[in-house]
Design a protein with these regions (language model features):
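Short capping segments at the starts of secondary-structure elements
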Residues: 2-10
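Acyl-donor binding region in acyl/amide transferases
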Residues: 6, 17-39, 85-239
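Low-complexity, charged, repeat-rich alpha-helical/coil interaction segments
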Residues: 9, 40-47, 78-85
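The alpha-helix within a helix-turn-helix
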Residues: 12, 16
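Charged low-complexity interaction tracts in eukaryotic proteins
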Residues: 22, 28-67
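Conserved N-terminal entry element of GNAT/NAT acetyltransferase domains
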Residues: 50, 56-90
Length: 239
């Protein structure tokens, strides 16, 4: 009640400061705290604040351009397309094209990622290398029973260890690309890229990768070929 005059944003900052809830690089986890407090507010569990009415967020609008139109087929043996590289995306124009590709060609579409994230283009062939697909890595799911059982940690250990787990939330080989064994090769390259880049951007070593495979669409064959381990089924993904 001492903080009843604070706006929700200010309250989130204050809670993070009092609990010393920080990212590995030292910044406060204010966004995560705000989202949590907002969910409590909507349930009426913060009685000193007005009950927030859920409102529909304006969906992210992806502007589609001809740049993401289907291209000439990429076919042949993987050796013909070496070296294949995963190139981190840092420029605005590249981010926009990345969003377009996922929006148009990934069955889940594109959503603005929440929290930590790394984007990569998959490029292959001799110069100029062609874009063959996209990889998106984000912060880990808050709870996932098969994963948590595999690791064997409790609530406290999970809370401290999640910064070392990275989720492969999107993996797209563009529909005009038909190169056998490309997907598993890319997953191996992606794992090395995350191991290199995650500590640079977020100050935490990436020690485990996770993903969810929709069995109604895919069998997860490329993940198994890249030495990923199937842990079981889950009912959903939550932060």
């Amino acid at each position: 009640r001492d903080f009843r005059n604070l706006a929700l944003t200010e309250l989130a900052h204050t809670v993070c400061e009092l609990l010393d809830w920080r990212r590995p690089q030292g910044g406060l986890k204010s966004r995560e705290c705000y989202q949590f407090l907002q969910s409590l507010q909507q349930r009426g569990w913060l009685p000193w604040l007005p009950t927030a009415k859920p409102h529909a967020r304006r969906p992210h609008q992806t502007v589609v351009s001809a740049e993401s139109d289907p291209q000439l087929p990429c076919t042949g043996d993987l050796r013909q397309w070496l070296p294949v590289e995963v190139q981190q995306i840092t420029e605005r124009r590249e981010r926009q094209l990345f969003q377009q590709y996922l929006h148009r060609y990934h069955y889940l579409g594109y959503r603005v990622p929440y929290g930590a994230q790394l984007r990569y283009f998959i490029r292959g062939g001799r110069a100029p290398a062609r874009i063959l697909g996209c990889l998106l890595f984000t912060s880990a799911a808050w709870k996932m029973a098969p994963r948590d059982g595999y690791i064997g940690w409790d609530e406290s250990a999970r809370s401290g260890g999640l910064t070392h787990i990275v989720n492969n939330s999107r993996f797209l080989i563009l529909p005009w690309v038909h190169i056998p064994n490309l997907a598993s090769h890319v997953l191996s390259l992606g794992a090395k890229a995350v191991e290199r880049d995650w500590p640079v951007h977020y100050g935490a070593e990436a020690v485990l990768l996770e993903t969810l495979v929709d069995r109604s669409h895919y069998a997860g064959t490329c993940y198994r070929a890249a030495n990923w381990v199937a842990l079981g089924r889950t009912t959903g993904r939550g932060k």
